[in-house]
A protein has these predicted regions:
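Short, conserved "switch-loop" micro-motifs in signal-transduction and mechanochemical regulators
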Residues: 87-88
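Acidic, metal-coordinating helix/loop segments flanking the phosphotransfer/catalytic sites
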Residues: 32-51
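Receiver (REC) domain active-site loop signature in two-component systems and cognate sites
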Residues: 58
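C-terminal output helix
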Residues: 109-119
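Conserved acidic segment of CheY-like receiver
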Residues: 2-13, 18-22, 52
């Protein structure tokens, strides 16, 4: 069961879309961060984050920089990451998956596509 999802994206519109999309998950809290550095602050403040939705192209600390640092933190190893980005370059997809992401969804995406991936990752 998903209780807390951290969405990391520099677009307020995307955060609103996630909020609407994630309303289907009962008792699930959406935590928003505008870049990778802010995401680390949220991870330190919020316990029990179950999933991270991560954009690639962001200011301050991009998604791949975040993933590189994230994978070095033992405390976060159990939190799955789904990359959701307009960055559709094959090398970014491969790099993100090699860095530990559990999935990659290209924007724009269908809600059913993201839902299926979340369900697959959230299922024991």
């Amino acid at each position: 069961m998903l209780r807390k999802i951290l969405a990391v994206d520099d677009s307020a519109l995307i955060h609103q879309m996630y909020k609407l999309f994630l309303s289907r998950y009962k008792n699930c809290k959406l935590i928003s961060a505008m870049n990778g550095l802010e995401a680390f602050d949220k991870l330190a403040q919020e316990e029990g984050i179950d999933l991270i939705l991560l954009d690639i192209n962001m200011p301050v600390m991009n998604g791949l920089e975040f993933l590189q640092r994230f994978q070095k933190e033992a405390a976060y190893q159990s939190i799955p990451v789904i990359i959701i980005s307009t960055e559709g370059k094959e090398e970014d997809t491969i790099r993100g998956l090699k860095m530990g992401a559990k999935g990659y969804v290209k924007k724009p995406f269908q809600a059913s596509e993201l839902h299926s991936l979340i369900e697959k990752i959230a299922s024991p």
